[in-house]
A protein has these predicted regions:
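Two-component/phosphorelay signaling modules centered on CheY-like receiver
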Residues: 11-29
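CheY-like receiver
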Residues: 122-159
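Active-site residues of response regulator receiver
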Residues: 52-54
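C-terminal output helix
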Residues: 107-117, 124, 128
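As written
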Residues: 66, 94-102
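Acidic, metal-coordinating helix/loop segments flanking the phosphotransfer/catalytic sites
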Residues: 5, 30-48
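Short amphipathic alpha-helix used as the core "switch/output" element in two-component signaling
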Residues: 39, 61-76
Length: 159
């Protein structure tokens, strides 16, 4: 089973994506901070890391800088960025962060799962970027995900 590390501070987004990937047979570890992500990577092998672009690290860096750090420290691992801010392939290339692709939020889970499958099975040197228009929402293939999204939104409102 392939292990995916998901680094996202938004609990609802992380829960939705992690659940969809687990249903498809991936082992998913969720980290809320760059520090937690580094600890996971030190402890076990990870095939792919997905980092929220808006992540803020302890030193004030963002998801791009964490992606650069991970690409240098773990060259065999693929790194993807995710965000509700849309980035073009050209913007990602200019950022020179070494990522293999970009997953826009909100997630089209069917597309994301297929893309992750492609990236996990591709050699690390495969640098074809994927950058799609923001997804159309929750895939009917994952009906339990809508429940997660609703429950998470309710929890957020109560805080």
């Amino acid at each position: 089973m392939m292990t995916i590390l998901l680094v996202d501070v938004v609990d609802a987004d992380a829960a939705i994506l992690a659940s969809a990937l687990r249903v498809e047979g991936f082992d998913v570890i969720v980290a809320k901070t760059a520090k937690d992500a580094r600890e996971v990577l030190t402890a076990q092998p990870v095939a792919l890391t997905i980092i929220d672009l808006m992540l803020r690290t302890e030193g004030g860096a963002n998801g791009l800088e964490l992606a650069r750090e991970l690409r240098l420290g773990y060259p065999a691992m693929r790194v993807l960025l995710t965000s509700s801010y849309h980035l073009s392939e050209r913007q990602l290339e200019r950022a020179d962060c070494g990522v293999s692709g970009f997953i826009p939020k909100p997630y089209d889970l069917r597309e994301v799962v297929e893309f992750v499958r492609t990236k996990v099975s591709a050699p690390p040197s495969s640098r074809r970027l994927w950058c799609a228009e923001p997804g159309s929402g929750i895939s009917a293939r994952f009906p339990h995900i809508e429940t997660l999204r609703t429950a998470s939104a309710d929890d957020d409102r109560r805080r």
